Amino acid sequence: GLRFFITDSDLFTGLFYVILLAATLIYLKICGDDIKTTLRIHPIHIGSFFLIILLAFTIRPVAGFITLIANLFFKDMTTTTMTQKVMQNLSLSILTTAFLPGLVEETIFRGVVYSRVRKANPIKGILLSALFFGIAHMNFQQFCYAFFLGIVFGFLIEASDSILSSMTAHMVFNGSSLLLTYLLSKTDIFNTAANTASGNVSSTDLTTIIASIPMALIGLVLSILLIIAIAYLNGRLGYMKTWFYKQYRASWPKEKSAGFSFFAAV
C-alpha cells in the first residue's frame, strides 16, 4: 500500500487522513447530502468555546483511569511509538496526531456515522458511533478509552448542535496528550509510564489505579456539568432533557438507524 512507497510515518499518517477526508466528502456528494447540514457545521456560542476546551481537560482523569484499567488486561501498543514521534518532531506530531485526527475522525464518526445512526434514537446513535470510533483505533487498549471519548463527543455535538465543538475537544485532548508525553519523556516520571506500557503491572500500579479513582470521579462530574452548561448556552438543554423522559422516548420512531450496507461500509 502507501506505506510501501512512503517511509516517513508522519507523512504517511498525514496523507492517509487527507485521502480519508476526501473520500468522506465524495461519499456525501454521491449520496446527495448537504455537507453543512449532515456534518452540522454550525457556529457555537462563544462562551461555550472556552467550556469545550476545559472539557477536554476534565475528561482526561477519566480517560486516564480507563487506560490504567485497560493496561491490566491489554498491552499498550502506542505509548513508546508516540514518544519517539513526539521527540523527533513535536510540531509535526501535533499536526498528524491532534489536528488531522480531530478534523477527519470527527467528520467521519460524529458527522457521517452519527448522522445515520441517530435517526431513530440519539442515545443509541451516540453509543453506536462511539463503538465504531473505538473499533477504528484497531487495538483493545485504545478501544477502551476511545469508546468513552466517543460518548463524550457524541453528547457534546448534541449539546452544541455543531461538529466544531467535538473537533475542538478532540484536537485539544490529543494535543495536550502529546505535550504531556513530551514533558514526561524528559523526566523520570516517564519511566514509570513506560513500565506500565510494557505490561509490567505490579501492586504499585494497582495502588495507582485505586488512588486515581477520586480524580476520575471529580473529572466525570465536572465533565457532565460542563456539557450541561454548554447545552444551556446553545439553547439545547431543554431538548436533551427530553431524552430521559420515558414518555418522550416512547414517541421515537421504531425504525432502523441505518441499513446493513452502511454498517458494512463502516
Give residue ranges: language-model regions.
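Alpha-helical transmembrane segments of multi-pass integral membrane proteins
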Residues: 211-227, 262-266
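Juxtamembrane helix-loop-helix connectors linking adjacent transmembrane helices
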Residues: 8, 36-107
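Membrane-interface helix/loop boundary segments of multi-pass membrane proteins
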Residues: 104-128, 155-162
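Small-polar-interrupted transmembrane alpha-helices in polytopic inner-membrane proteins
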Residues: 121-141, 146-151, 171
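Hydrophobic alpha-helical transmembrane segments
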Residues: 14, 49-54, 91, 95, ...
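Alpha-helical transmembrane segments in multi-pass membrane proteins
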Residues: 1-28, 217-221
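Functionally important transmembrane alpha-helices
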Residues: 142-209, 235
